[in-house]
């Protein structure tokens, strides 16, 4: 895609329709473009990115991700049944279906992806779906049972939460615990300055866990609610605008994470990308992966990414937050 600018990238997003989504009760009506854009700008970092990149296109020329090696990971997994008691404010309450797991798995298969790890919280554990995910050749890690907040939990509470999730996931291993297990701290803020981290890390190491931070977070969950709302009212213009803005944010976030990590490590590190198991991802993952590849990225297994010495330091966990801060700082300079 030589000579491609951000404008062209956005236009390409506008013409790509999702592969199909779970049927919803349609509500008539189309939101004015200004309303749709206003909702998008409320997403953390979105308005900052649009402002900072308004006059910049040089970074998007050619294949801006050329040379990047990225491992894809997924936070959570859709469940097998729609919850009839779901919060009325949850626009995506119908995302929990086997069809959406199939859509995620097919997106990986279509793009010849390596086995992809989904990090599971026991509170939302669905044995049928997790077993199907493994059956499709993918992997499962732990996100803790209840996704505890680091600032409101002691080390002992965190350890108990991890152990509780261990017990839930044990049913997936057929009676024999895997030789290597994977854990991701919930949330996006780094733990390196938290007084509890050493105690929790010692527990994880003792129990054969490998820590898996993410260096790139695309905030897809924030886009998903707006996307589901647009689909429910058959507002194709708004859903197209959502996808276009998502790619703009993805481009900016990925390039900033690459630059920050390279400055810290002294080399182009192998990155770990995190997306959520939500309706937006289910519908658009296949196109997103193809887009990353078209811009030069190569997807690699998670274990290969973790071999990068960068992940032996505490810096890796801070890259996401630093990229977000850099986006806001760039906008303020305009």
Per-region residue spans from a language model:
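Active-site beta->alpha N-cap acidic-glycine motif
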Residues: 35-185, 288-291, 298, 305-307, ...
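Bacterial signal peptide processing site
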Residues: 22-23
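Positively charged n-region of N-terminal signal peptides that target proteins for export
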Residues: 1-5
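Structural recognition of alpha->loop->beta junctions
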Residues: 137, 206-207, 325-329
């Amino acid at each position: 895609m030589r000579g491609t600018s951000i404008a062209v990238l956005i236009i390409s997003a506008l013409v790509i329709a999702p592969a199909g989504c779970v049927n919803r009760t349609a509500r008539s009506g189309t939101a004015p473009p200004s309303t749709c854009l206003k909702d998008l700008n409320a997403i953390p970092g979105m308005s900052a990115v649009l402002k900072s990149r308004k006059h910049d296109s040089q970074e998007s020329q050619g294949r801006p991700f050329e040379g990047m090696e990225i491992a894809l990971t997924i936070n959570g997994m859709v469940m097998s049944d729609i919850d009839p008691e779901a919060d009325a404010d949850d626009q995506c309450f119908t995302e929990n279906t086997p069809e959406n797991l199939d859509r995620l798995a097919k997106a990986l298969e279509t793009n010849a992806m390596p086995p992809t790890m989904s990090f599971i919280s026991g509170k939302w554990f669905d044995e049928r779906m997790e077993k199907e995910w493994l059956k499709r050749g993918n992997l499962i890690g732990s996100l803790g049972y209840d996704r505890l907040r680091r600032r409101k939990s002691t080390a002992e509470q965190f350890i108990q939460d991890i152990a509780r999730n261990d017990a839930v996931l044990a049913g997936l291993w057929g009676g024999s615990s895997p030789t290597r297990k994977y854990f991701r701290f919930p949330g996006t803020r780094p733990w390196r300055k938290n007084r509890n981290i050493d105690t929790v890390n010692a527990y994880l190491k003792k129990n054969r866990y490998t820590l898996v931070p993410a260096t790139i977070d695309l905030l897809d969950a924030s886009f998903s609610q707006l996307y589901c709302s647009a689909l429910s009212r058959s507002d194709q213009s708004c859903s197209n605008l959502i996808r276009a803005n998502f790619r703009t944010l993805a481009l900016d976030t990925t390039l900033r994470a690459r630059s920050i990590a390279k400055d810290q490590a002294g080399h182009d590190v192998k990155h770990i990308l995190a997306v959520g198991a939500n309706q937006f991802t289910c519908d658009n993952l296949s196109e997103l992966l193809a887009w990353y590849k078209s811009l030069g990225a190569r997807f690699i297994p998670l274990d290969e990414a973790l071999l990068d010495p960068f992940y032996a330091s505490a810096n890796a966990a801070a890259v996401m937050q630093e990229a977000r801060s850099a986006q806001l700082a760039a906008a303020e300079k305009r």
